[in-house]
C-alpha cells in the first residue's frame, strides 16, 4: 500500500531531521503505520488525522494505543497448537470493550534456541 511506503519514508528520512516532539506513545507516525496495517484506508486516515490534531500542547499526551475491532472465532477442541510457528507474532490484542481491542506491537525479535 502506498500509504505504508510514504510513512516508512517519513520515519526513515524526514523524522530524524527534526526533534522528537510527539506527546503520545507510540509516536504519531508509528500510530499511523499500525492503523494503516490493521484498518481500511478511510478508518485509518481519520484515526490518524484526529490523533495528529490531539498531538499539541493543549492535550496531556501519554499512552494512546490504536484501537481495532476484530472477531475471534473459537478454536476446535481437537486443535493441537504448533509452538514453532512459521509466521512471527507481531501484534498483541488487549481487550478494551466488546469486540474492541488495543493494538500493541511486539518489538522484540525471536531468537533461535
From Swiss-Prot:
<keyword id="KW-0997">Cell inner membrane</keyword>
<dbReference type="InterPro" id="IPR002696">
    <property type="entry name" value="Membr_insert_effic_factor_YidD"/>
</dbReference>
<comment type="function">
    <text>Could be involved in insertion of integral membrane proteins into the membrane.</text>
</comment>
<dbReference type="Pfam" id="PF01809">
    <property type="entry name" value="YidD"/>
</dbReference>
<keyword id="KW-1003">Cell membrane</keyword>
<dbReference type="GO" id="GO:0005886">
    <property type="term" value="C:plasma membrane"/>
</dbReference>
<protein>
    <recommendedName>
        <fullName>Putative membrane protein insertion efficiency factor</fullName>
    </recommendedName>
</protein>
<keyword id="KW-0472">Membrane</keyword>
<comment type="similarity">
    <text>Belongs to the UPF0161 family.</text>
</comment>
Amino acid at each position: 500500500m502506498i500509504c505504508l511506503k510514504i510513512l516508512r519514508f517519513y520515519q526513515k528520512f524526514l523524522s530524524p531531521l527534526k526533534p522528537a516532539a510527539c506527546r503520545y506513545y507510540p509516536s504519531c507516525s508509528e500510530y499511523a503505520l499500525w492503523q494503516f496495517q490493521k484498518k481500511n484506508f478511510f478508518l485509518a486516515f481519520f484515526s490518524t488525522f484526529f490523533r495528529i490534531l490531539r498531538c499539541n500542547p493543549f492535550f496531556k499526551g501519554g499512552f494512546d494505543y490504536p484501537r481495532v475491532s476484530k472477531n475471534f472465532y473459537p478454536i476446535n477442541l481437537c486443535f493441537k497448537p504448533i509452538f514453532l510457528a512459521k509466521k512471527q507474532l507481531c501484534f498483541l490484542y488487549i481487550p478494551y470493550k466488546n469486540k474492541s481491542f488495543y493494538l500493541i506491537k511486539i518489538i522484540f525479535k525471536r531468537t533461535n534456541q
